[in-house]
Amino acid sequence: MAKIIGIDLGTTNSCVAVMENNKPKVIENAEGTRTTPSIVAYAEDNEVLVGASAKRQAVTNPENTLFAIKRLIGRKFDEEVVQKDISVTPYKIVRADNNDAWIEVRGRKIAPPEVSAQVLMKMKKTAEDYLGESVTEAVITVPAYFNDSQRQATKDAGRIAGLEVKRIINEPTAAALAFGMDKKEGDRKIAVYDLGGGTFDISIIEIAEIEGEHQFEVLATNGDTFLGGEDFDSSVISYLVEEFRKESGIDLKKDMLALQRLKDAAEKAKIELSSSQQTEVNLPYITADASGPKHLAVKITRAKLESLVEELIERTAGPCRTALKDAGLSVSDIDDVILVGGQTRMPKVQDKVKEIFGKEPRKDVNPDEAVAIGAAIQGGVLQGDVKDVLLLDVTPLSLGIETLGGVMTKLIQKNTTIPTKAQQIFSTAEDSQTAVTIHVLQGEREMASGNKSLGQFNLTDIPPAQRGMPQIEVTFDIDANGILHVSAKDKATGKENKIKIQASSGLSEDEIQKMVKDAETHAEEDKKALELVNSRNQCDAMIHSVKKSLTEYGDKLEADEKSKIEAALKDAEEALKSGDKEAIDAKTQVLTEASHKLAEKMYAQEQAQAGQQAGPGAGSASAGQSGEKPVEGEVVDAEFEEVKDKK
């Protein structure tokens, strides 16, 4: 039976794990590392690079190297957080036809789930290489505070990658599974503080033994889906840019290549300062002006870094206190605090966690791998390999509909255990009203306009009646993935309409199917693209060689021979523009055959010159000064071989 793998699809890095002999195992990728950068690069000639290879070329290809795409998934272009990202990312974030935030790469608009699918495909391949068998099913994690649209978009990404997503689970819950599976210490309440590359979550979870069953119940969750290590990096980048501007008067903000180098340097400096008190950012030739090249050299102390990101760290305190309040607990009720996400390695973050919860956070959980391990355990539960484990998760935000006066009426409160179902009766607002619009919302604000719109649909053909008379039953049903299904039914006629909330990724079923097919044919396309590149390179090399030789030896050819070669050259150049591999190969062959006569003339001339050489020393020197040496230089290997054979 094929394994269900667990994937932590992270903002900065991703990780994959699987259950093996009843134990979760993190799988190393082809590069030998246990985590993979969540970076996708679109090179020329349609080549797609994922992970470390994409990260390595980012400095030279910033506009087409996509990172932190998870921050855009399921978001609208006009959202404030998206607009903020536009000002700091080297790649182009654009408005899609349905007002979603998409990315434009090499003239093509790409949906965030399609980019995330590339990372998931890399994770899938990593697992397949290790297991030696095909993988088609996965448990994928998302931030606990992801809304319905973001969850649906993540599920779409899985489908595009060729994976059936058996379950979407929250990252802190997955980390709790990883922490608590082997703990037999009785009932305990834990706080999972998850500060990753792009998102922050806090979950209060109760781990209990109930009739021999290991139960993980989420009591409350909170967070910020636009707060993470990327923001810490941005603070360091802004500081470096400002320091350089003060010193040189040059603003690096509009220099994409410089910004990409700064991003790499800022991330390295931030990591170094977790274990040392001072580091130096050294970037030679960062830019240049009329006076020459400029170099950036800035010392950063740990204290300086902490002052730069103090506000970001403080932003995590509010959600922690809210989660405790929602769970009906005080700080003293928490037995353990677990740190998840690479950014929690920063000493100042650990100090803040200790300050909030009044106790030292535990260090026995790997912050980079815990989430993937938990996802693999959940995969084992779904497969039946892991027994006696019950996971009770919650919906992070309240769900409801817009009612008269633009008010949001909540049907399901935040932190309700899922799966769950809720029903409520509504009526019409006007006399003789024959249709109602059900506008589905998610959020905590009282007014509809302050909440996230998840979608809307109409219930029509309601028999005319006085306002308030018809009875419209609205049902909200949240599945185990936290994805919402809504229906509305006229109780008088039995007429019903329903909607499965589509992600604001805006991907219709047809678009998803198209992307699935694109992904399936991607390997074949890669092969064809590589063959085309090779053919182009061969043709280009032949054109260059023939042109050069024609310039030097063309006068020794008959007129018809020369015109034949020139015609073949022109045809080959035209074929290069077409991108048709067969045409390029054919014209390369024609050019090769047409240039045979030219090669004969070249060979004859070289033989004549070789015969005129007086001696190896003097001959070489005089030839070098005669102006004829460059001709020999072009065929230097063959020419010297010839001479040695003769002597």
Curated annotation (Swiss-Prot):
Modified residues (Phosphothreonine): 199
Pfam families with a match to the protein in the record: HSP70
CDD domains named among the record's database cross-references: ASKHA_NBD_HSP70_DnaK-like
Record-linked InterPro entries: ATPase_NBD (IPR043129), Chaperone_DnaK (IPR012725), Heat_shock_70_CS (IPR018181), HSP70_C_sf (IPR029048), HSP70_peptide-bd_sf (IPR029047), Hsp_70_fam (IPR013126)
GO MF entries: ATP binding; ATP-dependent protein folding chaperone; unfolded protein binding
Domain of life according to the entry: Bacteria
Matching Gene3D superfamilies: 1.20.1270.10, 3.30.420.40, Actin, Chain A, domain 4, Substrate Binding Domain Of DNAk, Chain A, domain 1
PROSITE patterns for this protein: HSP70_1, HSP70_2, HSP70_3
Induction statement: By stress conditions e.g. heat shock.
Region (Disordered): 602-647
Annotated keywords: ATP-binding, Chaperone, Nucleotide-binding, Phosphoprotein, Stress response
Biased composition (Low complexity): 604-627
HAMAP family: DnaK
Function description: Acts as a chaperone.
Similarity field: Belongs to the heat shock protein 70 family.
Protein name as annotated: Chaperone protein DnaK
Organism listed in the record: Nitrosomonas eutropha (strain DSM 101675 / C91 / Nm57)
